[in-house]
């Protein structure tokens, strides 16, 4: 049933052109976002899902903490799975995968997967607003 609905939806087909993003992730993202125009910028989607770091500032102390975990935890988990799949299983080369693998060397796998998940959310929102398909090269904004 879900697969049949996704095949009929142009938006789902558009999002599923991203390596690592399947039917469940695409439909869940569309259902959670509802209307892409609700966000002023695509960058705001990462914060809305809870994939950006919390900031602590007091006096001379200023550091970024863990992710905020705001928003839809189910969608956050699906984006993390898509990022994990992109980094580990997808063999198609893309700028996003290359960027994620470089981050993995420097930060470790989990932090790199969170960063790629946030970037995926931003790219998915941009794709929904513009209607352009995923480009493996120059996908990083």
Language model features: what each stretch is:
Residues 1-141:
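A detector of single, family-specific signature residues
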């Amino acid at each position: 049933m879900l697969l049949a609905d996704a095949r009929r939806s142009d938006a789902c087909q558009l999002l599923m052109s991203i390596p690592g993003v399947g039917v469940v992730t695409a439909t869940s993202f569309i259902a959670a976002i509802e209307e892409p125009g609700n966000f002023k910028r695509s960058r705001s989607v990462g914060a809305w899902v809870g994939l950006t770091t919390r900031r602590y500032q007091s006096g001379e102390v200023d550091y970024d903490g863990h992710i905020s975990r705001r928003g839809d935890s189910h969608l956050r988990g699906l984006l993390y799975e898509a990022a994990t799949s992109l980094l580990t299983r997808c063999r198609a080369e893309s700028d996003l995968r290359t960027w994620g693998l470089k981050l993995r060397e420097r930060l470790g796998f989990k932090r790199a997967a969170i960063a790629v998940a946030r970037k995926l959310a931003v790219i998915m929102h941009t794709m929904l607003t513009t209607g352009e398909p995923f480009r493996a090269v120059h996908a990083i904004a």
